[in-house]
Amino acid sequence: MQDGIALERKTKEELKQIAQGLEIERISVLKKDEIIEKIREKRKLLEEKKLSDAQSQQKKRERPADAVEGKGILDVMNDGFGFLRVSNYSSSRSDIYVSPVQIQRFNLKTGDEIIGDCRPIQDPDKYAPLLFVKSINGDPLEIALKRKPFEYLTPIYPTERLNLDNGGQGNAPGKLIDLLSPIGKGQRGMIVAPPKAGKTTLIKTIANSITKNHPEVKLIVLLIDERPEEVTDMKESIDGDVVFSTFDQMPENHCKISEMVLERAMRLVEQKKDVVILLDSITRLARANNLTVTPTGRTLSGGLDPDALYKPKKFFGAARNIREGGSLTILATALVETGSRMDDVIFEEFKGTGNMELKLDRTLQERRIFPAIDIIKSGTRREEAMLSNLEREAAWHIRREAAKTSNAEVMSLLLKIINKADSTRDMLDTIIKYYGKN
């Protein structure tokens, strides 16, 4: 189906060719608008027939008495068949085989979460086959058949904020991010972090705030080239999917896992769901791609191949708010001040591609000030769409004061105000009252 392509932009001759392919008769006497209407009607009938055929085929096949329910993330191979990955989006002996016929019949794609019945493994050298499809990404089968491809969805600026503040006392990181660098649904944000600046703690705080305040959002934390103990800590600290490829695994695995996570998020957005990916880190993902990409003979400063940035940029660039419904928010950490020239080049290449930036300041962390946010260098494009008048005024006063004095001085005072305030409104009033005098 050529769903998503605007028929109105086609010429009459192009529309006639499409109509002929759909076996629509007497198109020569029809006007352009009438041809478009006929094409839409025919496509709708074909979709309904495809769904009806798929459901009738499933009903014809009797459910074996020994069938068990299976669940996994689909990974479609180049040969047309696929496997449901049941553990960490990676291949294992527990995977479930999906035939090419089922993939075509139900319009299945890589990244779809499939729940269905499968036959238990008879031969230890073979995979359990999928027999019946019950749901796709938690929705009925007809929704997957009618969904628009991700590439044809209309991206727009974020308009709805992901509130990290619980509205009560404390929770300084959530309150400060909401005020200084708000995150909207569909944001493409970068957390710029030097070593030991508290980025992992900040990621956990953001993840827990999102799951608590926005239960409708699907949260995925992607850890690339991280320490195994950090993966365990993240799994135990947050309520969401933690997908990982630790530093002791091959760079090819880093790349494959990140591609699967992106496909998973895109499939959910196609079905009008809100998704948040927290990636730690985009620097290490680019490094992994640099080791796996076919050398072009050209290198940037630091030994980085220009082609190594293509897939990380595709990943980061997929973040968007969708006019038709749904959103994909990506917050990725970028490592700076590591002593590696390659890391600096990677950051420079991604600088400006996002629409939100949260810069961490190591000097604040050394003074045990958390969150160690650099007030001047952090911000969100078009933040006025997500902030109230009171919040905008408070943020303006904070930035002006940070420019006049020092980041550490302002942050220390802000943390005192936040910890003493009974509510978010009380905090904003105190900030405006205090800085308004100066």
Regions found by a protein language model. Give the residues of each.
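P-loop NTP-binding catalytic core
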Residues: 120-191
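Charged, low-complexity terminal tails
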Residues: 1-81, 88-94
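P-loop NTPase catalytic core
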Residues: 197-198, 206-438
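N-terminal "pre-motor" subdomain/linker immediately upstream of P-loop NTPase catalytic cores
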Residues: 54-144
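Short flexible coil/turn linkers enriched for glycine and charged/polar residues
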Residues: 66-68, 76-80, 89-92, 108-112, ...
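Short beta-strands and strand-coil junctions in structured, solvent-facing domains, enriched
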Residues: 26, 91-92, 104, 123, ...
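Glycine-rich phosphate-binding P-loop
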Residues: 183-203, 225
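Phosphate-interacting basic helix/loop segments used at nucleotide- and nucleic-acid interfaces
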Residues: 64-70, 172-176, 261-266, 315
